[in-house]
Amino acid sequence: MVAASKEFVFHHTFKDVSQLEDGDFFKSPEEIHYNAEWFILVIRTKDQLEAYLHCDNEKDDNVAWTVDAEFSLKIASSSGSYAMKFQKGCFDGFGLGWNDFVSWDSLTEDFLYDNSFTIEACVKITKMTGFSKDVLRSFDESEKRFSDVILVVGDEKFYVLKLFLASHSSYFNALFLGKFKEADQSEVTLQNIDPTDFQSLLEVLYGEPAIDDGTIDGVLLLAHMLDVTLAIRKCEEFLIEKSMKSMRELLKMANQYQLENLKTVCISKINTI
């Protein structure tokens, strides 16, 4: 099984840049991706523009957490030139970035348009710890008598029914009802899956309201990887009816996961603007 890759891109346009003096800063609005809050901070320091990516735990500031990630920040000019830097690091409450992202002269001469510039963050999460969600339904040992297989995901065990999962997912149908060795095993390990995302996915299948703007990235990624059509449909309905994500984000998700109804709604809204 191909690993689920937690990746996302977000942009922000900083305006009235000429007003920035030494020590002044701009902060982008926060965006929620994979249960974490993300924003970009830029600071003018003498003759440099500093640029940092920040991550925070939206659920609980009192719990120790970390996010290992690879990311880049990029600004581009109308002529096609760009400034971009790449970094690997661990977010644990402090921003990561550069105190010399681009010189102030270069920014004002090469990258400003109408006294503004747009910065893009491309992020790939490799590991998350300390992020939790409210449990809407338990799949722990208390469910043992209602299950026929234990799925080991990360350091958690989920007690579930093979036929139930097989009826919702072509992946589990092949795994449990096909000729794989897992069909006869009472405990199966699923590699490269986040247990928090898997918990949310199971809750969706059991009818719980587990989808929100914080969980949907992980649920949709996993549902697409495991071909769980019901969860994909529920995610699309949420994105159309309730999500607060930007039109840019919605269109990106529609294209990435072939969500044609969402794509149609987005295009219709754009055409009426």
UniProtKB/Swiss-Prot annotation:
Keywords: Ubl conjugation pathway. Pathway: Protein modification; protein ubiquitination. It comes from the Eukaryota. GO terms for biological process: protein ubiquitination. Pfam families: BTB, MATH. InterPro entries: BTB-MATH_domain_protein (IPR052664), BTB/POZ_dom (IPR000210), MATH/TRAF_dom (IPR002083), SKP1/BTB/POZ_sf (IPR011333), TRAF-like (IPR008974). Residues 147-206 form the BTB domain. The keyword Transferase does not apply. Residues 7-123 form the MATH domain. Interacts with cul-3. Probable substrate-specific adapter of an E3 ubiquitin-protein ligase complex which mediates the ubiquitination and subsequent proteasomal degradation of target proteins. This is BTB and MATH domain-containing protein 15.
